[in-house]
C-alpha cells in the first residue's frame, strides 16, 4: 500500500505516528511551501529598499538557495523521516527511508498531485482543536479531504477534545 503523509507545521508528528502505527513500508512524506507564504516572504525585503543591503538572492545565479522557508521545510521532512525510522530517500534510492517531497505552489493542488497513484492519504485536523466538527478542518484541508483520489486517514494532532457535546443527528 502506497501512502502519502501530508506534513504541516504543528501537526506532522501525529501524521507520522499514524503511518508508523500502520506499519506502512511505501511512504511518501509531503510538505508544501504555499505560494502566498513564499510571496510574502520574498516581498518583505522590498519594503527595505534603499537600506544599503543586498538580498541573498541578488548574487549571480540567484535562486532559492538559502531560503529560510526551504530550509525549515527540509528540516521538517528530515525530522519526519527520522521519526518514521529512516533517512530521507527517494523513489530511486533503494534502502532509504520514505520518499520525501518538498513542493511549492498552491497547497491543495500540490497535495492532490502528490496523491496520484497512492492508496492512502494521512493528514491531520488543523482547524479549531478544542471542538469536534467541521471547524476542526481548515479550508485547505477540507478541500483536500473532499477531493482526494484515494482513501483518507484523518488524525487528531493531540488528544480528542473530551466533554464536547455532539450536535444532534440530522433528521431523515
Model-assigned labels for residue ranges:
Residues 1-61, 147, 171-172:
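Small/aliphatic-rich secondary-structure junction motif
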Residues 6-10, 124-126, 156-158:
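Structural motif
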Residues 10-11, 82-121, 159-172:
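Structural beta-alpha unit
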Residues 14-19, 110-114, 140:
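A short acidic, amphipathic alpha-helical/loop segment
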Residues 28-30, 99-103, 153-155:
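General small-molecule cofactor/ligand-binding pocket signal
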Residues 51-75, 130:
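A short acidic, glycine-rich active-site loop
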Residues 120-146, 161-165:
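Glycine-rich, Arg-bearing micro-motifs that act as flexible, cationic patches
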Residues 143-157:
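Short, acidic/small-residue loops that bind anionic groups at enzyme active sites
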Amino acid at each position: 500500500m502506497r501512502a502519502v503523509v501530508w506534513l504541516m507545521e504543528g501537526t506532522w508528528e501525529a501524521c507520522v505516528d499514524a503511518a508508523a502505527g500502520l506499519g506502512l513500508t511505501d511512504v511518501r512524506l509531503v510538505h508544501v511551501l504555499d505560494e502566498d507564504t513564499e510571496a510574502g516572504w520574498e516581498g518583505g525585503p522590498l519594503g527595505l529598499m534603499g537600506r544599503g543591503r543586498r538580498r541573498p538572492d541578488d548574487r549571480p545565479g540567484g535562486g532559492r538557495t538559502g531560503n529560510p522557508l526551504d530550509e525549515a521545510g527540509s528540516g521538517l521532512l528530515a525530522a519526519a523521516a527520522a521519526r518514521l525510522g529512516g533517512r530521507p530517500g527517494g523513489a530511486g534510492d533503494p534502502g532509504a527511508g520514505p520518499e520525501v517531497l518538498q513542493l511549492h505552489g498552491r497547497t491543495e493542488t500540490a497535495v492532490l498531485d502528490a496523491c496520484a497513484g497512492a492508496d492512502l492519504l494521512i493528514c491531520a485536523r488543523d482547524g479549531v482543536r478544542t471542538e469536534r466538527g467541521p471547524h476542526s478542518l481548515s479550508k485547505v484541508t477540507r478541500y483536500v479531504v473532499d477531493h482526494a483520489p484515494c482513501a483518507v486517514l484523518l488524525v487528531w494532532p493531540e488528544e480528542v477534545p473530551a466533554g464536547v457535546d455532539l450536535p444532534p443527528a440530522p433528521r431523515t
